[in-house]
């Protein structure tokens, strides 16, 4: 039993009912060594155990950013550096010797917010729900199937596929083989559509979790990982403050997407009327729409910043938000119960931090699929709650207390917000009162523009920032959203060289800096471009575009032109054409009597004949006869055609002693017909087949070159490969 009450020297106990073990949590907890008692206990955090001997979770300890040569900096200052990812980082100052980014990062969950008045909280949540109903139009909120949760919906805005390169979560990371990472080993498919692979640990955990959420709140295990990002120098050399992000199990993320994908789309689509600005395009006329909305009630803005926002949300508030979302989305009793149990799970969980296991009570994990949307809803609820509480305590009339939408204009993105307050109520609702009200339940709010200020004062919109961008009015319609210069200039000092050379990464950053600087001053942007061309001999005019290209970019954005995100329209204007020409090819294209290419939409590789050898390009199958089938997978290079990088071609396709060439050479020797194939067209397999032919045999070289010549007519026009790659052929 358990003690439940007491008084006047007497205690009262209650028998505990039999508790059903949570199976999906046990599969993870079998890797834990739980301490006899909790250590380092706080309101929202406690050290409860450690990973068993031999169990290790890898997290990056070296930055992916590479410092550029001095000449690349173009005389501009650097106010940011890569964050501290290891306790052995030599940049850690002496006065914080022993600083550990893992341990410091988890502390944001130590002190969640206090208790809110239940009735008032649900009252303002109902107000928010009413605002959703007012703009719901023809949106519906059905649960999507697992295939849609994985693949998204083609050509439907804000219904993208699940990120496949990110971590699979705990405990699945423990089964990685050397070189494996991400979610792909738990998926299988033809390169366009994927499904969850049967028999894997993720599929088993998914089935278990699906059953569990219909009965109770599941127990989650997250991995806390330091974030590799560029931070202000004070957060490195003065007071180190590395942020951590949470990696949640893949099966949990899939189920959350199934239940809430349509709700997220609704919030993003209706940002024109709702406070949440997730999905906003700062280059378009949307920024002006935000400015005009805020100034509808005046130009007195509270620019707010929360302290440790990620760790604030309590289970009380999460329960309220879950109820509100359920009431709004509808559905049967079972679906509502599943939704709420999923949301409540992320508020009470275990977190693996290096080798330690912590119990976390509160906050929203940053790796949660709904993180930014839920944070925005939480942010709005706090502001609305304080508004009503302050107004009532200040003696306002019931009519004034219910007039949030009349006196306030409000935009929010996660923990970022701007609150425009009508001068009519400045004496009843202002920064001082808001700061004091939030402090009562453990929430610290400061000035978002200058975090060192002890007070929170009204600012004109032109002196505010939102998403680290300012507001500059160019006309009645157009407002620019200049990004802070410190973030821009740092891009010339540090670049991410994943899958590209230092020069290519730098060029991309330089183009972005010029484009962003244009919003500060077209002259500054033009001067920087000229200086770069003058100081960097290897940089050509064609690589960074012209100032006219930059002007055209903004004109297109403001005209509502839907950009192709896979190309850079400033530098790659030739790529604005169609992806492919002509009709789909429904036959095998034979380059030679024994080497062909085809589209997997019209052919089934699983019915391969004995004398055929199929080369599957960019598929993800795990079971096939290696004497009949080979699979080629690569991370696509820059451009939009999906072709591999030059480095991959050299090390895999062109390396004579490599496994790929050996296997293809064997197939040729066995007199098999080799068929290169991919889903969605014949261009990629034709190029790959042509490369193979041009390198495999001098007698076949002519066929390979002829094939590549034809293919390159499309490839070059569409920008599928960079110019430097053509010398490979």
From Swiss-Prot:
Q: Which Gene3D superfamilies has this protein been placed in? A: 3.30.70.270
Give the UniProt entry's GO cellular component terms.
host cell endoplasmic reticulum
What is one process in the GO biological process aspect for this record? DNA-templated transcription
Keyword list (alphabetical) reads: Covalent protein-RNA linkage, Host endoplasmic reticulum, Hydrolase, Nucleotide-binding, Nucleotidyltransferase, Protease, RNA-directed RNA polymerase, Thiol protease, Transferase, Viral RNA replication
Q: Under which EC number(s) is this enzyme classified?
A: 3.4.22.-, 2.7.7.48
Q: Which domain of life is it from?
A: Viruses
Q: Where is the RdRp catalytic domain?
A: 299-429
The molecular function terms in GO held by this entry are:
cysteine-type endopeptidase activity; nucleotide binding; RNA binding; RNA-directed RNA polymerase activity
Catalysed reactions, as listed in the record: RNA(n) + a ribonucleoside 5'-triphosphate = RNA(n+1) + diphosphate
Q: Which residues form the Peptidase C3 domain?
A: 1-21
The annotated site for Cleavage falls at 26-27
Q: Cross-referenced Pfam families, in alphabetical order?
A: RdRP_1
The name under which this protein is listed is: RNA1 polyprotein
């Amino acid at each position: 039993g358990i003690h439940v009450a007491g008084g006047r020297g007497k205690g009262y106990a209650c028998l505990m009912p039999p508790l059903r073990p949570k199976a999906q949590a046990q599969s993870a907890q079998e890797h834990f060594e739980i301490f006899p008692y909790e250590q380092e206990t706080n309101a929202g955090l406690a050290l409860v155990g450690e990973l068993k001997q031999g169990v290790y979770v890898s997290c990056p300890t070296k930055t992916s950013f590479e410092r550029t040569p001095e000449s690349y900096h173009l005389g501009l200052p650097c106010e940011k550096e890569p964050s501290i990812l290891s306790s052995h980082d030599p940049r850690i100052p002496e006065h914080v010797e022993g600083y550990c980014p893992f341990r410091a990062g988890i502390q944001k969950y130590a002190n969640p917010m206090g208790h809110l008045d239940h009735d008032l909280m649900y009252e303002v949540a109902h107000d928010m729900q009413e605002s959703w109903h007012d703009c719901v139009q023809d949106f519906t909120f059905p649960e999507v199937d697992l295939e849609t949760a994985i693949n998204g919906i083609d050509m439907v805005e804000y219904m993208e596929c699940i990120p496949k390169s990110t971590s699979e979560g705990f405990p699945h990371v423990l089964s990685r083989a050397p070189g494996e990472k991400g979610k792909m080993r738990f998926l299988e498919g033809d390169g366009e559509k994927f499904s969850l692979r049967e028999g894997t640990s993720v599929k088993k955990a998914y089935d278990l979790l699906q059953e569990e959420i219909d009965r109770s709140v599941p127990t989650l295990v997250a991995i806390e990982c330091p974030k590799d990002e560029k931070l202000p120098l004070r957060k490195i050399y003065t007071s180190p403050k590395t942020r951590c992000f949470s990696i949640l199990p893949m099966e949990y993320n899939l189920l959350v997407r199934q239940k809430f994908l349509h709700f997220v789309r609704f919030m993003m689509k209706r940002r024109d009327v709702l406070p949440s600005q997730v999905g906003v395009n700062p280059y378009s006329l949307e920024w002006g729409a935000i400015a005009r909305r805020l100034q509808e009630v005046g130009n007195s803005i509270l620019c707010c910043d929360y302290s440790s926002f990620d760790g604030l949300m309590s289970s009380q508030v999460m329960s309220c938000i879950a109820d509100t979302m359920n009431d709004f989305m509808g559905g049967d009793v079972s679906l509502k119960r599943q939704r709420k149990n999923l949301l409540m799970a992320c508020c009470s969980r275990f977190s693996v931090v290096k080798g330690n296991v912590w119990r976390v009570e509160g906050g929203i994990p940053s790796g949660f699929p709904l993180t930014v949307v839920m944070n925005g809803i939480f942010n709005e609820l706090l502001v609305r709650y304080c508004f009503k509480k302050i107004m009532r305590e200040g003696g306002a009339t019931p009519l004034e207390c219910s007039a949030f939408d009349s006196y306030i204009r409000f935009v929010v993105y996660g923990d970022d917000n701007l609150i425009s307050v009508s001068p009519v109520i400045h004496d009843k609702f202002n920064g001082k009162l808001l700061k004091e009200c939030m402090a009562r339940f453990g929430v610290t709010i400061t000035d978002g523009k200058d975090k060192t200020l002890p007070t929170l004062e009204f600012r004109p919109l032109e002196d505010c920032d939102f998403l680290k961008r300012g507001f500059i009015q160019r006309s009645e319609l157009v407002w620019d959203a200049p990004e802070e210069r410190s973030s821009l200039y740092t891009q010339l000092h540090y670049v991410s060289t994943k899958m590209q050379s230092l020069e290519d990464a730098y060029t991309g950053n330089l183009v972005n800096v010029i484009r962003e600087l244009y919003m500060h001053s077209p002259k500054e942007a033009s001067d920087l471009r000229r200086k770069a061309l003058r100081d960097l001999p290897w940089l050509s005019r064609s690589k960074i575009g012209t100032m006219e290209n930059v002007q055209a970019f903004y004109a297109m954005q403001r005209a509502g032109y839907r950009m192709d995100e896979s190309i850079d329209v400033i530098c790659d204007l030739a790529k604005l054409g169609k992806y492919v020409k002509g009709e789909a090819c429904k036959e095998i294209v034979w380059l030679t009597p024994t080497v062909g290419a085809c589209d997997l939409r019209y052919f089934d590789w699983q019915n391969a004949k004995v004398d055929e050898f199929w080369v599957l390009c960019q598929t993800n199958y795990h079971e096939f006869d290696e004497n009949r089938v080979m699979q080629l997978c690569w991370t696509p290079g820059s451009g939009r055609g999906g072709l591999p990088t030059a480095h991959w071609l050299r090390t895999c396709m062109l390396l004579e002693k490599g496994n790929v060439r050996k296997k293809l050479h064997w197939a040729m020797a066995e007199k098999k017909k080799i068929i290169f194939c991919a889903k969605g067209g014949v261009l990629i397999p034709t190029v790959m087949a042509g490369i193979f032919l041009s390198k495999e045999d001098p007698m076949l070289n002519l066929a390979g070159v002829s094939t590549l010549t034809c293919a390159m007519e499309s490839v070059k026009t569409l920008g599928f490969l960079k110019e430097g790659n053509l010398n490979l052929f």
